[in-house]
Amino acid sequence: MTDFSASPDLQDPTTHAGFVAIVGKPNVGKSTLLNAFLGTKVAPTSPRPQTTRRGVRGIYTLDNRQLIFVDTPGLHKPKDALGKYMNSEVHSALSDVDAVVWVVDLRHPPTDEDRLVANSVRDLPKPLFLVGNKTDAAKYPEEAMKLYGALLEGRGSDLPVSETMLSAQNSVNAVATLREQLLEVLPENPFFFPQGAASDQSREMWAAEIIREEAMKKLRDELPYAVATRVNRWTEREDGLQRIEGEIIVEKNAHKGMVIGAGGKQLREIGQAARKQLEVFLNHKVYLGLEVIVIPGWREDEEALRELGYE
């Protein structure tokens, strides 16, 4: 079972440890890259933009060095209070980290959202790593990479940019090489987390994100973006069965019916898919109970956002 404990454990001061922000516009593969860095799944992934809503921290420890990756939401032009919160997570991460990984989608030239990211990272006095993703599906990946690099022109000569292009053929080796480069730029610090910790998330938050990931895969149109999830109860029986009780939160009664589906079919499919993921990572049988509840306009309600963990 993945260890999600994260109580601080200060170690020998000769160790090196630091934080690395993974940034980029929505849906460029930031969470997938985080999971690849760690070799385990701590962040939800889906083909839909804005799957990541809060800064998820993943921890990689090797010998006397510890990397704490911060997977940030996609930087975008917000439409509601939730979107503003997500952008604030990005800017907060950038202010506190020791290095930055900027992930870009080489299938397309830079967009206004990419320029937002470039403007946020260009002048940071921190090591910057530009990662070109989705190379296999790009017609002209090298040309696209040059366009993204050009957005960083004006960065001082004392602030070099390291570039990496990921493809299906080189993904494993390229990720390992990039991780080694990040390990080398860590400042001298005591460890921030105990060895063996994979994330600072509680197990309840991690499970809630798995449920939301599967909901986003199943639901259509704009509905996935009006969905939140939480786990209210988690108990373990003597035989190892994990009993998890969760909620899917929507904004309207009409949305509730869409999530449940005819005869409960949609909700069952979401629950079954989430349960299978949980069983793989927990290495235990899981009973997952899901209820759909309505919190009107929760994305614009700051109190509701806080209750759902967006604070």
UniProtKB/Swiss-Prot annotation:
Span list, region G5: 166-168
Record family assignment: Belongs to the TRAFAC class TrmE-Era-EngA-EngB-Septin-like GTPase superfamily. Era GTPase family.
Location of region: G1: 24-31
Organism ancestry: Bacteria, Thermotogati, Deinococcota, Deinococci, Deinococcales
Boundaries of every Era-type G domain copy: 16-188
InterPro entries in alphabetical order: G_ERA_dom (IPR030388), GTP-bd (IPR006073), GTPase_Era-like (IPR005662), KH_dom-like_a/b (IPR015946), KH_dom_type_2 (IPR004044), KH_sf_prok-type (IPR009019), P-loop_NTPase (IPR027417), Small_GTP-bd (IPR005225)
Region named G4: 133-136
Single GO MF descriptor: GTP binding
Main location: cytoplasm
GO cellular component annotations of the record: cytosol; plasma membrane
PANTHER family reported for this sequence: GTPASE ERA, GTPASE ERA, MITOCHONDRIAL
Binding-site list for GTP: 24-31, 71-75, 133-136
Subcellular location(s) of the protein: Cytoplasm; Cell membrane
Segments for region (G3): 71-74
Stated name of the protein: GTPase Era
Keywords linked to the UniProt accession: Cell membrane, Cytoplasm, GTP-binding, Membrane, Nucleotide-binding, Ribosome biogenesis, RNA-binding, rRNA-binding
Keyword Manganese: no
NCBIfam families recorded: era, PRK00089.1, small_GTP
Pfam families (alphabetical): KH_2, MMR_HSR1
GO terms (BP aspect): ribosomal small subunit assembly
Region of interest (G2), ranges: 50-54
Gene it is expressed from: era
General function of this protein: An essential GTPase that binds both GDP and GTP, with rapid nucleotide exchange. Plays a role in 16S rRNA processing and 30S ribosomal subunit biogenesis and possibly also in cell cycle regulation and energy metabolism.
Boundaries of every KH type-2 domain copy: 219-296
Membrane topology summary: Peripheral membrane protein
Subunit structure: Monomer.
Gene3D superfamilies recorded: 3.30.300.20, P-loop containing nucleotide triphosphate hydrolases (3.40.50.300)
